């Protein structure tokens, strides 16, 4: 792995001169294709949790960006659409059906998944868009018209509801993508962006918008936090009243309750939100 990282780092330093040496470019393209395939298989990830902290593998982001630089756009076709892109689809008409059967993946018409994404077992993909570098773990549902940004990380047994936007990020290199940990529910038409981390078991109501500067308020205590939804929190949209009379309030999100793991497993989402 260290030699692979070294090759990417060296190529990154001369990314503006890559086309000046054709033999090195051929070697680099093979390496980049291998990395993209490793992303497809989930053996390499853009972001990993180590000792309770999420860390970005910047060299993987660099590899993806180098892949864009060194790959020419081409025309792609399927039975009902055509497009012109540098990034191939992960699945095509030539994909062996046994790949889907063995992994128990269900992908319906209108779902766009770019290569360089990991789709684990028992994932259901409704008409949606999943960008390069994303990681979708086992048993998760990506519902209709959801968008999963580049490098976003989605955990096990999550439900990403219809029309939801999960932000990704390739640049700046050190920036984390949005991370949705295991067993989370993200309500319809919500938007989670700018590297926000939604910790395990959290429930996000419909129509909640969270970025890095969004105030996240504990209703019981008034404490304000940013950039992180604590584990097993139940979150709804809210308004923080202005201190001065007659001034407009500002949007915020409110943690209305926190439940333990056992309660989260037993109680329906609708009951938690009520």
Curated annotation (Swiss-Prot):
Q: In which pathway does it act?
A: Amino-acid biosynthesis; L-lysine biosynthesis via DAP pathway; LL-2,6-diaminopimelate from (S)-tetrahydrodipicolinate (succinylase route): step 1/3
- State the GO CC annotations: cytoplasm
Could you say which residues form the signal peptide? Answer: none
Which biological processes are named by the entry's GO terms?
A: diaminopimelate biosynthetic process; lysine biosynthetic process via diaminopimelate
Q: Which molecular-function annotations from GO does this UniProt entry contain?
A: 2,3,4,5-tetrahydropyridine-2,6-dicarboxylate N-succinyltransferase activity
Q: Specify the domain of life of the species encoding this protein.
A: Bacteria
Instruction: Name the chemical reaction catalysed here.
Output: (S)-2,3,4,5-tetrahydrodipicolinate + succinyl-CoA + H2O = (S)-2-succinylamino-6-oxoheptanedioate + CoA
Give residues annotated as binding substrate.
106, 143
Localization per Swiss-Prot or TrEMBL = Cytoplasm
> Which InterPro entries does this entry report, sorted A to Z?
DapD_Trfase_Hexpep_rpt_fam, Hexapep, THP_succinylTrfase_dom1, THP_succinylTrfase_N_sf, Trans_hexapeptide_repeat, Trimer_LpxA-like_sf
Write down a Pfam family by its short name.
Hexapep
HAMAP family xrefs: DapD
Which family is it part of? Answer: Belongs to the transferase hexapeptide repeat family.
Q: How does it assemble?
A: Homotrimer.
Protein name in the entry: 2,3,4,5-tetrahydropyridine-2,6-dicarboxylate N-succinyltransferase
Species this protein is from: Rickettsia felis (strain ATCC VR-1525 / URRWXCal2) (Rickettsia azadi)
The record's gene field reads: dapD
